[in-house]
Amino acid sequence: MKQRSFLSILCFILLAFGVASVSAQTCIENRKYFTPNGTYDSNRRLILSSLPNNTASQDGFYYGSIGEEQDRVYALGMCIPRSTPSDCFNCIKGAAGWLIQDCVNQTDAYYWALDPTLCLVRYSNISFSGSAAFWEIEPQYLVLNTATIASDLTDFKNIWEDLTSRTITAASAARSTPSSSDNHYRVDFANLTKFQNIYALMQCTPDISSDECNNCLQRGVLEYQSCCGNNTGGYVMRPICFFRWQLFTFSKAFHNITLATPPKPPMNVPRPPSVGHGANTTDNDSRGVSAGIVVVITVPAVVIVLILVVLGFFICWRRKSLQRTEFESDSDVSTTNSLQYEFKTIEAATNKFSKSNKLGEGRFGEVYKGKFSNGTEVAVKRLSKVSGQDTKKFRNEAVLVSKIQHRNLARLLGFCLQGDGKFLIYEFVLNKSLDYFLFDPEKQGELDWTRRYKIIGGIAQGILHLHQDPQLTIIYRDFKASNILLDADMNPKISDFGMATVFGMEESRGNTNWIAETFVYMSPEYAVHGKFSMKSDVYSFGILILEIISGKKNSSLYQNDETTTAGNLVTYAWRLWRNGSQLKLLDSSIGRNYQSNEVTRCIHIALLCVQENPEDRPKLSTIVSMLTSNTISVPAPGIPGFFPQSRRELDPLSEGLESG
């Protein structure tokens, strides 16, 4: 402890004499790596080189991808609103160049560049649009000014907290243009003294939700406060959000703000050091700071100080950065403790698991609505003993799953253990599950084609996120309409991870004798042999697409007689497709308000998903591309799995569909 304090003193003295240049570029470690000069590297260089033009010409925000399969590179470019095209172009170009130069083999990296405007460049080997997963917000980096606020400025803390609080609120509020960099952006200022302002800037990527933006910015502000609350400025950066405050304007972001007029600065009072990136510290903005703000460090014995500086230089240099602090997640123990709820808290929230709070019941337990004392609404799942996990495995998997965050996944907030009882606490989703609307003739009309198409795309994004999580791979194995929740805006959220098998990074196949999924959604290899893989989820997703389009259950077709193979939704869709009358599959409650090309493409994709051979089914990344781009060619589907091979000549068009 004494040694750490001594090192801190040495580093502080050294910093008083000058500030090391700190880069805002981050090559994310502990991910996959690529081979330099290979196909992935070529695609990375190609998309990053095109990013300056694409971003500057598209209102300061661009997201795209290039390449195929494992060599595909996703990239994002973003400038703050009202940046000139020239500044935006140069900022993105500089940031992209730094990433190419410094991140020699990391598949995921980002750079918040500060000059000539503020901009973000990021690339990855997985799609990150709309993602606020745990690795998007941890770890993050903090850079600070070394000078501290004068002790006589007693109102500073209140003024600073009020400024950051209202800036978070304004920045996280969604705009009407979600694809523009103007979404989730705010600059503001407050008067500290008659002649001195405080300036704050906050920005999130425009593709995340307001709650996700608010959460990210709140974390940044709290971490800055706990670390460096008395310093005269700094910034916190993450892949999805950025927070900076200073006693001077910066990044040409404050053109429309009336600035306080500083008095003539006294002699020999140094202004605070600039926080730049790389070797470029040029900033033409106003940087005058009154003498009352900066604490001047006086050293009575200059010789002693110089000796300490020389001694401390090497030690501080070995710590890699004099001003950057990486906040990593706590140990596994503390993470577990932060997620574990006391039983009395859960019991009180659910009114002792009263019948009036019960939302539903499935094979693996009952679900209750709960409300904590702070007003937060949650869904509490009380697992039945058939779930079969031992306590240690249950706790470990709960911690892992809680780290997975995406707008199309119902977030696991924590868990509870009480004797033999196990409980999972999820975020509460306002609307009920998809099947509540989809299979009820009186409610089907609330799901027009636009909403259904959006639901299909959202589910695909959610599954892709589960399959491509860099920390673990989850094969869900329980896709069905009742496990898709709908929020207030009818956005889908995949729920109930109690069935999911958690794998290590390299393992993607497994076997089980426990065939627990609803049979009508099962892939042939899973139902017959108990084998599952990512392609098993693809098969189930294909069934779900057909149900969403038709408003019918896969099991809703009837059997003609005891000798005739039972028809189902898959066989019916295939026969309609083969006869060129696929639009007959569409739910009649939709009427004529639909795009026939979208419906046809979704049926086409669904039939590819339900192919008998897993190798013939597309990957989720390919499915997402097919759904989002009409320029991608879609191969012709073959006969689906579980098709009644012996009765191919049976005329299915005479078979009716019953209500689900």
From Swiss-Prot:
Residues 316-660 are cytoplasmic. Its EC number is 2.7.11.-. The chain crosses the membrane at residues 295-315. Residues 1-24 form the signal peptide. It comes from the Eukaryota. It is an enzyme of class 2 (transferase). Residues 264-273 have a biased composition (Pro residues). Keywords: ATP-binding, Glycoprotein, Kinase, Membrane, Nucleotide-binding, Phosphoprotein, Receptor, Repeat, Serine/threonine-protein kinase, Signal, Transferase, Transmembrane, Transmembrane helix. Glycans are attached at N37, N53, N105, N125, N191, N230, N256, N280, N284. Gene3D superfamilies: Gnk2 domain, C-X8-C-X2-C motif, Phosphorylase Kinase, domain 1, Transferase(Phosphotransferase) domain 1. The modification Phosphothreonine is found at T518. The active site is at D478 (proton acceptor). It is found in: Membrane. The keyword Transmembrane applies. Belongs to the protein kinase superfamily. Ser/Thr protein kinase family. CRK subfamily. This is Cysteine-rich receptor-like protein kinase 22. It comes from Arabidopsis thaliana. The lineage of its organism: Eukaryota, Viridiplantae, Streptophyta, Embryophyta, Tracheophyta.
